[in-house]
Amino acid sequence: MSGKIQLLVAFLLTSACLIYCTKYVTVFYGVPVWKNASIPLFCATKNRDTWGTIQCLPDNDDYQEIPLNVTEAFDAWDNIVTEQAVEDVWNLFETSIKPCVKLTPLCVTMNCNASTESAVATTSPSGPDMINDTDPCIQLNNCSGLREEDMVECQFNMTGLELDKKKQYSETWYSKDVVCESDNSTDRKRCYMNHCNTSVITESCDKHYWDAMRFRYCAPPGFVLLRCNDTNYSGFEPNCSKVVASTCTRMMETQPSTWLGFNGTRAENRTYIYWHGRDNRTIISLNKYYNLTILCRRPENKTVVPITLMSGRRFHSQKIINKKPRQAWCRFKGEWREAMQEVKQTLVKHPRYKGTNDTNKINFTAPEKDSDPEVAYMWTNCRGEFLYCNMTWFLNWVENKTGQQHNYVPCHIEQIINTWHKVGKNVYLPPREGELSCESTVTSIIANIDVDGDNRTNITFSAEVAELYRLELGDYKLVEVTPIGFAPTAEKRYSSAPGRHKRGVLVLGFLGFLTTAGAAMGAASLTLSAQSRTLFRGIVQQQQQLLDVVKRQQEMLRLTVWGTKNLQARVTAIEKYLADQARLNSWGCAFRQVCHTTVPWVNDTLTPEWNNMTWQEWEHKIRFLEANISESLEQAQIQQEKNMYELQKLNSWDVFGNWFDLTSWIKYIQYGVMIVVGIVALRIVIYVVQMLSRLRKGYRPVFSSPPGYIQQIHIHKDWEQPDREETEEDVGNDVGSRSWPWPIEYIHFLIRLLIRLLTRLYNSCRDLLSRLYLILQPLRDWLRLKAAYLQYGCEWIQEAFQALARVTRETLTSAGRSLWGALGRIGRGILAVPRRIRQGAEIALL
């Protein structure tokens, strides 16, 4: 008996587990989950009057940041935001400065004299090594060490206005713009332009300024920018714990330069270093406390005069009216030595640094002089002109080295510029006339950290212009919000159509649904309705803003990179939302926040911790299952639609009028016709087989016409009286064996064959059913036995419950009676107190 009870209990537990322990896939829409993205960003700015930012969105500084309780990886170098910034700034720079593109080589031999620089010019005039704003040499442009530009006077012959005659030209050039053959025998040399292998300007080009442009990047709807808010972030952090989400970045500076970064937006009251995760490339943000600035100036003593080579063609040379022009120069202001010392101290504390801790053995050094000019010299742009500054005096000053020290450096303006983003050269117009000056705040240093074998460290200035924008935006990363999530639950989809309930409208920001990113999955799931509506409302709002901008500036879309980016951002957002809704619709979950399905969960060992796990962590664990889950959901939805279609067809018979609809019976009529055609075809096959078998035995076909017809099956009839015209002799013996006509005989033959066929089918079905009965009889007995066990177990459980109820009832009754008696005695005792007092008083008085 105990074995039966154990079997019954095991059966009940197994059934309950199969019913209640099965998990089904549940689709959640609006979960705070994201993945890395690489789509174009668009810009927003306050100053939309400049040429490069006229198509940006108007910036109102209303970009809130939502703190997220998550951990995320950040890398300033492997970053789509910084890569887009580098590409876009280069395109704006290239288009704004406008290098001339109509170029023709001009390689003529010129006879040039030696340098016109006098001995007085080569010796530095006396004066202080350090200058300030009140020093008189600033206005006179004759500070100690500055000199005139090296010039050469050249003559060359070219065809002039008269094409059949040569004309001699005499021009003055910068000595750095010509290459001469080494010949010490005479004072005159054979020289060529140093860009003879490149090109020179043959037509007039417009001269443009490089406008100071500041803008911020914004993500399209459906995408978010995450920022690492950790103060110890150094450009590469696999586990940043202080993450905030925003739709736009901070303002970024676009001025390109080498060695130093100007007017950056990341300067703080501290020095910090962004270090590449795999090599020694760094970008150092300087402490703004030291007020580091640079003031560049070109004296007003140059005049550019074009040379007319032939009719309709002009060559813009460096035609110098003043044969001894002063150099351009840049002056550094601020506490540079203290700032550089703080850089060394910050480097020593950096976790990536492996060199010496002695700051006296850490030096700022310049790159090799045989490098490109942009590498060997500090290169920057001042009012559209490209300055190349020799930083030797500056390095001697900040390092207090032996040699000439100044807080200013000489510079030179060039026309042939190596491109900083792509391999190539651009040729620009000569400098404009008049004095040029520009002042910038120095906010960063581009450098490589080189640790030597003799326990010394060199901070070598670098020409990686792209590092400036990695410092500006390196703490951001672009992610795509994927609001669709899967999780196992015990609820199974109910197949009837769900009713739609009206909900109140919640006005939240676009990033409102991300506020639950760090919360547990269970808590986040409670707000999915509001989150999904917030997501959609934010997409629509940003779409409208983008559309307004595109409409206002549709005539200028061809001018900058922003026009196409605005259009692409709008299209991307619409495509993303439609793609999400298409996926939900393919699973039967369109416009639902929580959608239960009939698909079983594929991995019972993989279940979420609803109270301790975030949706982002859960998505990382099940990412490898998403493809299979999506396919299973689609198959389940297809099967569901088929079932609903068949059910709707059956429901059509509920209406009595549909029974008289001929279209409802056409299918069954077709089935009947097909059955008749099948029987006829089967009979034809049987007849052909029998005919062939009889031909093999020597019989003729039964349908042979007389007199070839031979009666095979005789139908005997009774004897008849002969006619009066006939005699008995005429009748003969044929009267007793008269046969039916052959068509009737053939019909009888077919009937007998059909009866034989039906009999055989009946016998076969009877044998099959009998064998099936014999096979299923043991199963029936086994099921009957198990049913008896189950019935006995149910009766036993019922009796146990009845006994338990009876005992409980008796116990409660007895307890109630006892309690009632106790309460009665207590009540009677309380009521007897006055009587006892009276009796006691009477006894005392007696």
Curated annotation (Swiss-Prot):
GO annotations of cellular component type: host cell endosome membrane; host cell plasma membrane; membrane; viral envelope; virion membrane
Residues spanned by motif Di-leucine internalization motif: 845-846
Span list, region V3: 296-329
Residue spans, topological domain Cytoplasmic: 693-846
Transmembrane segments: 672-692
Region of interest (V1), ranges: 112-153
Function comment: The surface protein gp120 (SU) attaches the virus to the host lymphoid cell by binding to the primary receptor CD4. This interaction induces a structural rearrangement creating a high affinity binding site for a chemokine coreceptor like CXCR4 and/or CCR5. This peculiar 2 stage receptor-interaction strategy allows gp120 to maintain the highly conserved coreceptor-binding site in a cryptic conformation, protected from neutralizing antibodies. Since CD4 also displays a binding site for the disulfide-isomerase P4HB/PDI, a P4HB/PDI-CD4-CXCR4-gp120 complex may form. The surface protein gp120 is a ligand for CD209/DC-SIGN and CLEC4M/DC-SIGNR, which are respectively found on dendritic cells (DCs), and on endothelial cells of liver sinusoids and lymph node sinuses. These interactions allow capture of viral particles at mucosal surfaces by these cells and subsequent transmission to permissive cells. DCs are professional antigen presenting cells, critical for host immunity by inducing specific immune responses against a broad variety of pathogens.
Annotated protein name in UniProt: Envelope glycoprotein gp160
Organismal lineage: Viruses, Riboviria, Pararnavirae, Artverviricota, Revtraviricetes
